[in-house]
């Protein structure tokens, strides 16, 4: 089941249930070419500018360590596919220690897939996160939308929006989306 909600805020994402787990899908068209966007999502120095500190082996099969300062999230992952400049697939392991020093959920595995498509001088990016606990899917939707917006700000040289204010603005709409997939 898929749900998309209208609202006063632009909602880039949708939520659905698949095999009893949540799926977050965020889609946005960026004002840059595919090679620049690919570099922004795969180059550790550029990732740090909008998303997270990522260390490790960023080739297929490589183990990575991810630290998202804004969310106080830390975890590990593995690069499953890296098909420049079109597709990146990473698996992550969430544990009770991943979030805010043990305040998280029981361990689970998730996949994050980014697909890029050139559209003239622009690029369409779709991020799909699978394996999220249904009780947390709204929060992941908000988080990934904020990450997509932060990427846009980074690429255009604008200042990022206040994450806490943005979170509070987006959460009701994503909670409505989550309730609809129930």
Language-model segments: residues:
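Amphipathic alpha-helical segments that line or abut small-molecule/effector binding pockets
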Residues: 35-38, 149
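Short solvent-exposed loop/turn micro-motifs enriched in small/polar/acidic residues
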Residues: 8, 21, 49, 72, ...
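A detector for short, charged/polar N-terminal pre-domain segments
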Residues: 9-17
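Residues at helix-coil transition
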Residues: 42-43, 84, 153-156
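Short beta-edge strand/loop motif at the mouth of beta-sheet-based domains
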Residues: 23-26, 32, 36, 44-78, ...
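A structural signal for short hydrophobic beta-strand segments in well-ordered beta-sheet cores
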Residues: 15, 79, 114-116
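A conserved amphipathic terminal alpha-helix motif
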Residues: 1-5, 131-182
């Amino acid at each position: 089941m898929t749900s998309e909600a209208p609202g006063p805020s632009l909602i880039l994402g949708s939520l659905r249930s698949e095999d009893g787990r949540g799926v977050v899908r965020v889609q946005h068209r960026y004002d840059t070419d595919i090679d620049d966007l690919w570099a922004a999502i795969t180059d550790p120095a550029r990732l740090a500018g909008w998303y997270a500190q990522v260390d490790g082996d960023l080739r297929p099969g490589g183990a990575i360590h991810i630290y998202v300062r804004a969310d106080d999230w830390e975890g590990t992952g593995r690069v499953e596919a890296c098909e420049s400049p079109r597709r990146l697939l990473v698996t992550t392991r969430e544990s009770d220690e991943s979030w805010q020093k043990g305040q998280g959920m029981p361990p689970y595995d998730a996949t994050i897939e980014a697909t890029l498509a050139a559209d003239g001088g622009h690029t369409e990016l779709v991020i799909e996160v699978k394996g999220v606990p249904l009780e947390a899917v709204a929060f992941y939707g908000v988080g990934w939308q904020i990450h997509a917006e932060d990427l846009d700000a980074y690429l255009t040289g604008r200042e990022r929006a206040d994450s806490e204010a943005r979170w509070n603005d987006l959460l009701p709409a994503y909670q409505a989306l989550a309730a609809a997939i129930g």
